[in-house]
Amino acid sequence: MNIAKQQQAFLGIDYGKKRIGLAFASSPLLIPLPIGNVEARSSLTLTAQALVSIIKERAVTTVVFGNPLPMQKAYASSVQSEIQELAALIQEMTAIEVILWDERLSSAQAERMLKSDCGLNRKQRKNSSDSLAATLILSSFLDSRKLY
């Protein structure tokens, strides 16, 4: 069975301790678009519940978390372990596919794009960079899978 022919909906997530950027793509076009940010909650369980409501609302079939792999293998961040825990919680709550995707430097790339290409001020960039980073993460994932 060709997986690209099935109805698919992807949620890209750029996790941050304060804000979580979101992007969405669905078949047949699978074009990732930023859909905004959600505020991180006081616990990972509450954050997972907030994300699960978006997952259900948009009938998401696959969640793609940006996984900030360290540039040096010996270093692992606390954010990385939070992402792994949050991904596991979402998978338990929804039983859908949750993928951790290498997102090294996606936030920096998003910030550069917004600064140079859009002419946004610092506050505007701050509000847009997380969802743009999620869009870059989801785009990278979809490109690698050639799902379009």
Swiss-Prot record:
One of its GO terms (cellular component) is cytosol. One of its GO terms (molecular function) is nuclease activity. GO terms for biological process: rRNA 5'-end processing. Pfam families: RuvX (PF03652). InterPro entries: RNaseH-like_sf (IPR012337), YqgF (IPR005227), YqgF/RNaseH-like_dom (IPR006641), YqgF/RNaseH-like_dom_sf (IPR037027). NCBIfam families: RNAse_H_YqgF. Belongs to the YqgF nuclease family. This is Putative pre-16S rRNA nuclease. The lineage of its organism: Bacteria, Pseudomonadati, Chlamydiota, Chlamydiia, Chlamydiales.
